[in-house]
Design a protein with these regions (language model features):
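An accessory alpha-helical subdomain
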Residues: 120-213
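Nucleotide-state sensing region of NTPase/ATPase domains
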Residues: 42-130, 134-146, 200-208, 218, ...
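Conserved NTPase motor "head" modules and their coupling/switch loops across ABC/AAA+ ATPases, GTPases
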Residues: 1-29, 43, 171-296, 305-309, ...
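Conserved lysine of the Walker
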Residues: 34
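Walker B catalytic acidic pair
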Residues: 300-302
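Short polybasic amphipathic segments
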Residues: 4, 66-72, 90-97, 254-259, ...
Length: 355
């Protein structure tokens, strides 16, 4: 990413910046707009905010619309330009290389961006559903041909559950459920295969990066469901009674552990943070190897909770070629032994400038 322009975005009225390759340190006091700047870059690169599901929230107070424009080179060679406009009424327009696109998925296929914010700790300590969603997003980045599997499976599952409830009400017989049973089984097997493939690609790097960050014997695992037409048919009576499908990948969990103990339950806040950072670094490495393109990393408020050794390990663990935007309240956050920032950007009162 070489150029970013924000127009009526959050705290920024007009802002234009040239971004350096490598490590970019964004410095400023709390509330100055550092996270807003990262959010603007993410919106421009991925088509949506990492902070809110309601895009209208990015529109600056009193403005009618917000606009983000980015320029850069994908895979180090191919120029790209994006323009995202969000209107206060809720309409959003995405333009990639001068042409309107219908979905932000087209941006995600073109540009890889990984994010850490304090809220991301929910992936480690939150519900299984959060971990499943995170894993399925990794599938979209690492195995693009399988990106829609989770959505397709969810749609088939919803149809089967609706048919189960109609059967419970006596409106249909089991023949109405059968086609959706077959679809859930077929898509479930494909989704489980994709999940296992991604976990196998990420797990070794996760263990290595966690150890470097001071969390030895960390492990990433996934236990597949035994989803099949036969398994679903065996549970049909129970499923009809409950009105929901009782076996499948929608009920599985991603296991993050250290020394055989679940970090969700037994991990300290610091260990959970390290695990999330190790997961991000492992995915960045896997993406670099699988796609020959180093992703962009957006790291918000991560350095303040790490000691110097862990800061050095984190920044040193970023794969070669990654552009990293990291926020901090002080320019002393990067230790002497860590890679040096290629650029320092000072943020104050909704404006940003290169030092």
């Amino acid at each position: 990413m070489s150029h970013v322009r924000l127009h009526d975005f959050r705290s920024y009225s007009r802002q234009e910046l040239e971004l350096a390759e490598g490590l970019v340190l964004i410095v400023g006091p709390n509330g100055a707009g550092k996270t807003n700047l990262l959010e603007g870059v993410h919106l421009g690169a991925q088509g949506f905010s990492f902070r809110t599901r309601r895009d209208v929230g990015v529109v600056r107070f009193g403005a009618e619309a917000s606009r983000v424009e980015l320029r850069g080179r994908a895979r180090g060679e191919t120029p790209f330009a994006t323009r995202i406009t969000v209107e206060r009424g809720g309409a959003k327009k995405i333009v990639l290389d001068g042409a309107s696109v219908r979905s932000h998925e087209e941006l995600r296929r073109r540009l890889a961006v990984l994010v850490f914010t304090p809220d991301r700790l929910a992936v480690v300590k939150g519900s299984p559903a959060i971990r499943r969603r995170y894993l399925d997003r990794m599938i979209g980045r690492l195995v693009p041909s399988s990106a829609s599997l989770s959505t397709e499976y969810g749609a088939a599952l919803g149809q089967r559950n609706a048919a189960l409830r109609r059967m419970r009400a006596g409106l249909v017989d089991r023949e109405a459920v059968a086609p959706w049973t077959a679809a859930v089984a077929r898509l479930g097997v494909e989704l489980e295969r994709a999940r296992n493939e991604v976990v196998a690609a990420i797990a070794p790097g996760f263990t290595q990066e966690a150890a470097k960050l001071g969390l030895p014997s960390a492990d990433l695992g996934y236990v597949s469901s035994e989803v099949s037409v036969e398994a679903l048919d065996e549970r049909l009576a129970t499923d009809v009674e409950r009105g929901t499908t009782s076996v499948g990948p929608h009920l599985q969990d991603v296991e993050l552990s250290a020394d055989g103990r679940e970090l969700r339950i037994y991990g300290s806040q610091g260990q959970q943070r390290v695990a999330m950072l190790a997961l991000l670094l492992a995915e960045a490495r896997a993406l670099s190897e699988a796609t020959a393109e180093a992703p962009m990393l957006l790291l918000d408020d991560v350095l303040s909770e790490l000691d110097d050794d862990r800061r050095t390990s984190l920044l040193g663990g970023v794969p070669a070629g990654c552009q990293v935007l990291v926020t901090s309240t002080t320019d002393r956050a990067v230790p002497a032994g860590a890679p040096r920032p290629a650029q320092v950007i000072d943020v104050a009162a909704g404006s940003a400038r290169e030092r």
